[in-house]
Amino acid sequence: MKQTVTMIIEQDPESGWYGCDLDGTLAEYHGFEGLDKIGAPVGVDSPDSALNTVKKWIAEGRDVRILSARISHDPKGDGKAAIEAWTEQYLGRALPVTEKKDAKMITLLDDRAVQVEENTGRIVGGAKALQAAGDAHRQGEKGR
């Protein structure tokens, strides 16, 4: 007889983690130039920027991690080391780096993500939001 096990994970801010993309979200990005080439921080003077939000989360003692595709093909760990050094320099400490999200991730700040309403699949902002995201990505690719 087969048994089914259902696991419910509650989003407890004390036990989960907060993710933030690097390229184009925390750091300037105009196309890939190498694992160890990371742009200058963006949004330094904007209180509601991703950079300052991450700094606030760190000050509040939250578990903050960098979620970056940059390290998905990084066998020697050069990209990960560069990201850790960048976060130490601009955020005050080396943050953990991953290329994967998991069930404990509470939220993600990312320049390429488009918000989808939970359990409906509806794109928040509709087709306009999707079009704007595509346009922004194409514009960034032209800057290379």
What is the predicted function of each stretch?
Residues 1-143:
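Catalytic phosphate/metal-binding cores of nucleic-acid and nucleotide-processing enzymes, i.e., regions
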